[in-house]
A protein has these predicted regions:
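Membrane-interface alpha helices of multi-pass inner-membrane proteins
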Residues: 28, 131-135, 169-184, 227
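Transmembrane-helix signature of polytopic, membrane-embedded enzymes
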Residues: 21-22, 110-133
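Membrane-interface transmembrane helices that cradle and orient dolichyl/undecaprenyl
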Residues: 154-169
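Short hydrophobic/aromatic helix or loop-helix immediately within or flanking a transmembrane segment
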Residues: 66-93, 97
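Start-transfer (signal-anchor) and selected internal transmembrane alpha helices
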Residues: 1-30
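Short acidic/glycine- and proline-prone juxtamembrane loop motifs at membrane-interface regions
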Residues: 138-146
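Transmembrane catalytic cores of multi-pass membrane glycosyltransferases
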Residues: 52, 57, 184-197, 201-266
Length: 266
């Protein structure tokens, strides 16, 4: 079979291009759903605008009526600023654009990493599509879209580091510093790191894991943990993040934590 001309081959869309464009425009065309299915976007934009206008990040509540003066932990302040900036430039379309870009990049990285790890393109495309379908329930113009993106970047970095494809241990505390100021689910990064540490312990007990790798993994964890305190609320951020997932009332009334309801039509 004759191969196409190099220029033609370059111009023809690749599976990764189709995947990225498909996810991106699926979110863009479903823009109204991205913010109508959740009431938090207005609050995020308001807080972001306050930070942009005043140049300060409030640590005490100035937005509510009943809790004025109480401690306020803005665990999403950086993403709120980004959403506010996007809103100033493009209105609500800007916020949809940010969410769609994060979603498409997340799925693209998953696909590319699957290819790199030796999976057939068809298998990688199937898995990436499956991830897309499963995650689509959470396609909203909210800060948690940054966590989707950061989880993939974090796992990508750990996989390369664990397989000795990279020695950049600084990558993790830098990424964690951004993550911890963007969304409260930064704890997911430590959960993922924990799985690699458990695997290293198992390999070490079998005589296959090196002491140096173990030291590096624990050092990554220590440095990444240390930078989590570099945020406007300091140690209180951990209390908010851990407190939320351990709050039975909150988790029982938040869709993300509920079991799937197969009787819903939407």
């Amino acid at each position: 079979m004759k191969k196409p001309h190099p220029i033609l081959a370059y111009l023809l869309p690749q599976p990764r291009d189709i995947l990225f464009i498909g996810v991106f425009f699926s979110m863009v065309f479903g823009g109204t759903k991205l913010f109508n299915n959740d009431g938090d976007l207005g609050r995020h934009i308001t807080i972001g605008n306050y930070i942009l206008d005043t140049g300060t990040i409030p640590t005490y509540d100035i937005f509510s009526h009943t809790m004025v003066g109480e401690r306020l932990v803005l665990h999403e302040w950086l993403s709120q600023v980004i959403f506010a900036l996007a809103h100033r430039v493009m209105g609500l379309s800007g916020d949809v654009f940010i969410a769609a870009l994060l979603g498409a990049l997340t799925i693209l990285i998953v696909y590319e990493e699957l290819i790199k790890r030796g999976n057939f393109r068809l298998v990688a495309l199937f898995v990436a599509t499956l991830v897309t379908v499963v995650s689509s329930v959470h396609w909203l113009a909210r800060p948690h879209m940054f966590t989707f993106f950061f989880v993939v970047l974090w796992t990508y970095g750990l996989e390369r580091f664990y397989k000795n494809e990279s020695k950049s241990s600084w990558y993790f505390p830098v990424l964690m510093l951004i993550w911890v100021n963007t969304h409260g689910a930064f704890i997911a990064g430590f959960v993922v790191l924990g799985t690699y540490i458990v695997d290293w312990i198992w390999e070490f007990l079998q005589g296959r894991g090196s002491k140096e790798m173990g030291k590096q993994l624990f050092l990554i964890g220590l440095l990444s943990f240390a930078v989590t305190f570099i945020n406007p609320s300091g140690v209180y951020l951990w209390g908010t993040s851990v407190g939320y997932v351990s709050n039975e009332f909150m988790t029982s009334h938040t869709v993300e934590y509920l079991s799937p309801d197969f009787h819903e039509k939407d």
